[in-house]
Amino acid sequence: MSSSISIHLWICVLVFLPPCYPGLDYTYFEDDGLIIKKTDWYLHLKTKKLDDHIRKVVKNVERREGGYEANFNDHLSMDIGSPEHGLLIDSQLSEELYSLYVHAQIISEASYSIRRDECPSWKAAKDLRKVKLDKTSMGEMCLSLYYNKSACIGMNLKYRSPDGSCNNLKRSFSGKATTAYKRLLYPNYSNEFNEVPEEYYSDYRPSPRILSVAFVKDEHSPDDFKTMAMAYWTIFVGHDLSHTAISIMMISNRPVRCCHESRVELNPGKRYHELCLAVKVPVEDLFFSNNVRCMYYGRSVPAVRSDCTFGPKEQMNQATHYLDGSMIYGSSAKRTWLLRTNLDGQLLTSMGCDNKSHGDPLQPQYMPLEDTESNACQYGSGTCYRAGDIRANGLPQLTVMHTLWMREHNRLAKLLSHVNPHWDDERIFQEARKIVTASIQHITYAEWLPALLGENYTRWNGLELPTKGYSNAYNETTDPSVSNSFATAILPFANSMLSDTISLYTEHRVINASLSLREHYNRPTGLLSNYMDQLVRGLSTQNTQKIDMLFTQTLTNYLYSAHPIHEFGMDIVSLDIQRTRDHGIPSYSEFRKYCGLKAIRSVQDLSKIMVEGSTDRLLKQYRDWTDIELLVGALFEKHEDDSMVGPTMRCIIREQFIRTRMADRYFYDLPNIFNEYQLTEIRKVTLARIFCDNSNNVTMMQKKVFLIPAMADLQLCDSQLIPKININHWSEMVDTFKK
């Protein structure tokens, strides 16, 4: 191991901040030599001992990664356009987060090192959560991230920060991008800290690919009442709330290769790299039959615990934890800056086929082409769009949704500048962003959640918003963090709602053509300029697929495959199951207990709550019902009344969106966010109006775009039945006159 590598990593760990940072809140931490309590085994963990473990881990990382690069250097490069490249695009770690990632990974490994050497007990993980980092070499970094008293000084707190910081004025880090997902239940790791349980590789918890093949069918299963807009709004909102990244090499910043280019094991018969958790493909797999035995999966990027302690591994959310439009504007100041014109509050646009910005209102506007990052587009620079979230390009109609909201921002910015000609670029941008964010929140709670969970359920379970006046729902003690179970095991239900066939519709909702999702995955640029309006009508007309275990092969066999170059792709169900294991998500039965649902005590109990025919299939793969994983159980669960999901999934979704609202100081219906006239206008917003105002030339739309329309439901976009907001209520002169 070269000394230069050692110095590089150790400097990265230790020189995060100067030794004494004046803005840090040291009063939060106890100042005793033994750290925390005076009882139990961790009494003896003095700072020197903790730092010894940290140093040992750093040396182990240097040795491990140096040896890995020496042995497999020829196989570490990732082919541009490959399925692995496609996955890395969706899950890539932002450059500015690299240092945080390295710290979190070392703390995670040091936690296990302490447990192994100091207390080989099965309760050690919970004990170590009481041991603070503050006096160790990692302390300054964690304190600066979570307990920096000066973090909000100098910020314009009238508007949201790009990264979600300073929403909570007492805990500036709360809900911030780069912080950890929240645990609803204690994580399930085999060593209590970071390892996937060994039983996942035994006979009763087989490879995720075996489960995918056993459970998933590619059959048409349309929902008779809901449109494809349900699927894409789910994904759109999911990307606003969560973004999990894949770990990379901590010294070279290169991807960790788990599989050979030929997609066999890179290191057969031996332990994978610490950051690898490749999906094993069985020999008898009928699709991957041509020597494909390995599906790439890199472990998720860890996060530093918000209480600055050692303990079990947590995963980082790169997105802000708030419903704040971060998929449009980005989750960092840097990303937001890359999307702005810095003129008249506008977001950057392009003509769709080149990257020239234009101001001609008669020409359709598209998001700017991504030509700055060579690896950001699967098919090369300039073949995808730049958005607040890098995942905007995978699904054509998701790209449409991003385009509509980019246009909505610019439309509002233009109107605001007209009624307030004295406003500068920054004021126009922030006010337009504020209206866009409020509109997304209103559509999510007033239209999408009732359609997903059922109107009666949302009404009687704390999810219905007031239709008049202000709410008093904000609670500064509520944690806004997106739950790990929601992001990892529940949100993937949206993938089952997709179809390989993308139907294109005329103005009168007649299908005149169709496209294949497989042929256009990650290839959005030419598609939008040719089919924008047909795709918008498709969102509001084509039936979404039911939420179940039926998935298109585009996602289970051909995911990220560059058609027709690559014969095989990846499997989204296998990857999602593997991610739940990587994150230590407890079982389906444990979450039924959490939700207060009836416990499963027999095969008969299981049969009553699962869809017909699924119980035998489940117990053929799992030893018993206690081993069924949350993602699998939730997708097989019977739906309730007018809900699109089962009771366990509904419970976890409800828990998330109650906190998402209560913990947001900027939620749109709180006092001092909008005046009473403006709030009335926000409550008029519908997704139908967004489709009407921001398509190229759609002239008819149903008022409720999440519901399948009859011809009688279609209204002219100019109709008062699809109301418009009156931007004059944002004129400062008008407000002054009324007062």
Task: Put a short name on every predicted segment.
Residues S4-P22:
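Cleavable N-terminal signal peptides of Sec/SRP-targeted secreted and luminal proteins
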Residues H409-R411:
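Secondary-structure-rich domain cores
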